Amino acid sequence: MTSLKTPKGTMDESPRQCFLHEEIIERIRRVFVLYGAVPISTPTFEMKSILTNKYGEDTKLIYDLKDQGGEICALRYDLTVPFARYLASNKIRRMKRYQIGRVYRRDQPSIARGRLREFVQADFDIAGECIQMMADAEVVSCVDRILSMFGIGEYRIKVNDRRILTSILEVVGVSCESYGTVCSTIDKIEKMSWEDIGRELVLKGLSEEQVRTTKKYMTMGGKEDVLGLLKADPVYGIERCKAAVHDMEELFRLCRILGCSGSLVMDISLARGLDYYTGMILEAEYVGKSVGSVIGGGRYDNLTENLGERCVSTPCVGFSVGVSRIFSLLYEEYDKESSTMVYVGASGGLFLDERLSVLRILQDANICSETFYTRRSSFESQQKYVAKKKIPFIVVVGESEIAAGSVQVINALTRKKEIVKVEQMVSYLLDPENQ
């Protein structure tokens, strides 16, 4: 017998779920546009060679597709690598773009925590040379605006610099070749105990002493005072670390000007497991919520160059919003079941022609409206439908109303009833005093 269940890590969405997803996406999109970004679209699947060796240990999570006519393809893992491919293939050196679309990962799903195998990401990126940390600060500002907009609660934007992290690993004595795999383990700090982290690092070749030294650095926390601690540490003698610390100081300064430094935290343990990051990295989360980070991103200056021999380097910085995770935090309180503003009902008969005439007037005025389709529908059942869908108004067509060229307008919330001429119906419904 054919199974009717959805594949593991995927889900159907009810109208209520779709309405919330659409609202979240539209609100995020408006913020992207506010910051001057333009939209692009890229294919859901890419050439496998484009995606290979860009995600570190997460490469194993890529969904491969069956060979089609000699092209080895895979479903996109994120929207960042396709954007880099878009820049390189179109020889674009400067762009501020957003893209909202589905991505695919062979991860262990947890629907309650918003972790799926198919999910929507909303990306914002700035490509091109810029004044020191200016684009990075604008990215943080955009993240801050999105997090505050949803009113979910207190949030934290954690930042670090990949160069600081690799400098620490150099001081610890980790080989350059192991930076990526060690960072992938460090990236699990909030999901695993330090004992488990240590065991995994030992399996990757670190000694017990190296693990202890790594832990000392990774447990530095706080705000800009962490940068002061780094300046007093031997790691500051490494030039790339020195440059990164200066960049972080400038980031905090610019974020103060932009009014988004209040939730900004310097976190040395922030690693971001993806291989393509080169500078500032960030993650954002709502404090005390169980879904983990809802936004992640950073600077990736070499990704376009690494796509092929003839590709040039285009500095980029940006972030992805995990729409499903924000959805999981908002859904319980969300109750929208319909976009309909007016339900056209009938009392004492079918009155099909009259209902359709009223429906046309309402829809010509851009008022979302609907009516019933069955041959029989009691007015009581119509009212139950309106209550279930939380439709604000019922416009009732009946024998007496037809004779008078009128309709009865019922406010479904207040139960206020009013007889209104058909030609005045639209203005009555749109009058704020009648809402």
From Swiss-Prot:
GO cellular component: cytosol; mitochondrion
Enzyme nomenclature, EC number: 6.1.1.21
Protein name in UniProt: Probable histidine--tRNA ligase, cytoplasmic
GO biological process: histidyl-tRNA aminoacylation; mitochondrial translation
Organism (species): Encephalitozoon cuniculi (strain GB-M1) (Microsporidian parasite)
Domain of life: Eukaryota
Chief site of localization: cytoplasm
Keyword S-adenosyl-L-methionine: no
NCBIfam families: hisS (TIGR00442)
Example GO molecular function: histidine-tRNA ligase activity
Similarity-based family: Belongs to the class-II aminoacyl-tRNA synthetase family.
Cellular compartment(s): Cytoplasm
Matches recorded under InterPro entries: aa-tRNA-synth_II, aa-tRNA-synth_II/BPL/LPL, Anticodon-bd, Anticodon-bd_dom_sf, His-tRNA-ligase, HisRS-like_core, HisRS/HisZ, HisRS_anticodon
Keyword Endoplasmic reticulum: no
Catalytic activity: tRNA(His) + L-histidine + ATP = L-histidyl-tRNA(His) + AMP + diphosphate + H(+)
Keywords: Aminoacyl-tRNA synthetase, ATP-binding, Cytoplasm, Ligase, Nucleotide-binding, Protein biosynthesis
